[in-house]
Amino acid sequence: MASISPTSSSVAALRGHPVQFVKGGAVSKEAKGSISFSPVANSNNANVKFTGLRVAASLKRDGAFPGDGYSGNDNTVLPKSTSVRGQDYPTADSVLPTESIIVPEISNAGLKCVADMFSDEDKDTEQDLDSPTEGFSSISEAIKDIQQGKLVIVVDDESRENEGDLIMAASLVTPEAMAFVVRYGTGIVCVSMKEEDLERLNLPLMVATKENEEKLCTAFTVTVDAKEGTTTGVSAKDRAKTVMTLASPDSKPEDFNRPGHIFPLKYREGGVLKRAGHTEASVDLAMLAGLPPAAVLCEIVDEDGSMARLPKLRVFAERENLKIVSIADLIRYRRKRDRLVERSSVARLPLRWGNVRAYCYRSVIDGIEHIAMVKGEIGDGQGVLVRVHSECLTGDIFGSARCDCGDQLAMAMEMIEKAGRGVLVYLRGHEGRGIGLGHKLRAYNLQDDGRDTVEANEDLGLPVDSREYGIGAQILRDLGVRSMKLMTNNPAKYGGLKGYGLSIVGRVPLVTPITSENRRYLETKRTKMGHVYGLANGQASHQTGSNGAKGEH
């Protein structure tokens, strides 16, 4: 028995609880065993007992446990332990990260979690959902400019047009602003409007939705000019008049000539949360500014007449003193403020792990139903054991060996049951890190041909991880959770749950069995997607690939 000083939060968190230690690298049978910590009365120290473990030189050399009390030598083989269940831990031919891994063993006595699980960079990720993407203005700044009748530049994603539009509130347009739009834009001036206003003005779609062959299915209506106060309809003054007439709640169908020089667009209800386009972004910004739901938008062109891309847009914005914002930031801004789910039903549900209360939540955005399994009483909502699990049909239902999803789900439910209090939120629509079941199976074929899980998605032209956790955060808030011990290996999930009035007070790692089928997958998640598998030397065992991708299947 050796005495150590639990100055590290990792040791303090594990005091009095058995843990499993696995030496990094090629794991040998001799490396498996257990380490028990127990507090010393009237002392800040704890005793540590090694059982069934061949002590490695790196234990002492690397200082895996703080303090100088450890005295074992490099070749010591401590007594075998019968309490270790081999099927719960990596096998002899497994390959793990080079860092040491500490895995808490859960008992009915309670649950402790690792505190220093992610780097400061990971902890800061998306904590403030109002913080703009680097190089962009904040959405709140753009809203203020919209309120003042100013133009802003809105940029969409590279997977769409990757272009910038000049946008302003239609109700505040002036001939001078319109002249600026015509000068630096394509000349095709659009006004995005809600469906009820288009119906009120009898402005039908140019083509039926199912016949729309435009690349992004932009919903153009018939074009118009205002009858009163215009001449040809093409001048900046005439176009401003038409826009003002469209934005007026008092306008009538007979106030317009058809066709004309202004292109009304149909806004999709739900805005950027439903469709991440400029049409939806412009109306969302107008409404967030407290103005009528109509906005002017026009694509910005470069000096040679080509579409201006982001580098040129930044130069243009600085020269003209315009704010530039991204639709991605607007989506995050709205996700923080809009109610995304509604509780639809609740029932007692007996599971193989024990009885829980099952809560069904329906997304108000897409109608997808999600479920939360609640064990015990949430009470004050502090320190609740939580798992936010992404749907994986192949792993969760059919036990696919390609991933560790089913194992993580079962382990999380077992931990919650033993702790006697906790929540598992099961998010549907997250299949294959958001790419869907069909694409996931296509990615599997590419993995069989030699790609890893990241490369396969990229070869299919799909994002490495497109999941959002705002719905999960809102479900937790509705259930009364305020602070949580999060069961995850994924830094992106840590960041994705911050910013919704929730705090994360610790992490519980989920280290599942490694097999010949999922070994490369798990290693790719570590090296390219930033996953953390336990704690070493008081620091997170964490690497982020050069592409910065982060995710958990």
Swiss-Prot record:
Sequence segments annotated as region (DHBP synthase): 62-336
Positions of D-ribulose 5-phosphate binding = 160-161, 165, 275-279, 299
Q: How is the cofactor bound?
A: Binds 2 divalent metal cations per subunit. Magnesium or manganese.
**Residue ranges of region Disordered?**
70-90
Active site (catalytic residues): 465, 467
A Gene Ontology annotation in the biological process aspect, one of them, is:
riboflavin biosynthetic process
| Taxonomic superkingdom | Eukaryota
Query: Which InterPro entries does the record associate with it?
Result: DHBP_synth_RibB-like_a/b_dom, DHBP_synthase_RibB, GTP_cyclohydro_II, RibA, RibA-like_sf, Riboflavin_synth_RibBA
Task: Give residues annotated as binding Zn(2+).
Answer: 392, 403, 405
The pathway that the record names for this protein is:
Cofactor biosynthesis; riboflavin biosynthesis; 2-hydroxy-3-oxobutyl phosphate from D-ribulose 5-phosphate: step 1/1; Cofactor biosynthesis; riboflavin biosynthesis; 5-amino-6-(D-ribitylamino)uracil from GTP: step 1/4
The UniProt keywords, alphabetically, are: Chloroplast, GTP-binding, Hydrolase, Lyase, Magnesium, Manganese, Metal-binding, Multifunctional enzyme, Nucleotide-binding, Plastid, Riboflavin biosynthesis, Transit peptide, Zinc
| Record EC number | 4.1.99.12, 3.5.4.25
Binding positions for Mg(2+) 2 per the UniProt entry? 161, 278
- Give the binding site residues for Mg(2+) 1: 161
- Cofactor(s) listed: Mg(2+); Mn(2+); Zn(2+)
Q: Where is the composition biased (Polar residues)?
A: 72-85
The record lists GTP as bound by 387-391, 408, 431-433, 453, 488, 493
What main location does UniProt list?
Answer: plastid
One cellular-component annotation, GO: chloroplast
Function according to Swiss-Prot or TrEMBL: Involved in riboflavin biosynthesis. Catalyzes both the conversion of D-ribulose 5-phosphate to formate and 3,4-dihydroxy-2-butanone 4-phosphate and the conversion of GTP to 2,5-diamino-6-ribosylamino-4(3H)-pyrimidinone 5'-phosphate (DARP), formate and pyrophosphate.
Q: Which family does it belong to?
A: In the N-terminal section; belongs to the DHBP synthase family. In the C-terminal section; belongs to the GTP cyclohydrolase II family.
Per its record, how is this protein called by name?
A: Probable bifunctional riboflavin biosynthesis protein RIBA 2, chloroplastic
What is the gene name?
RIBA2
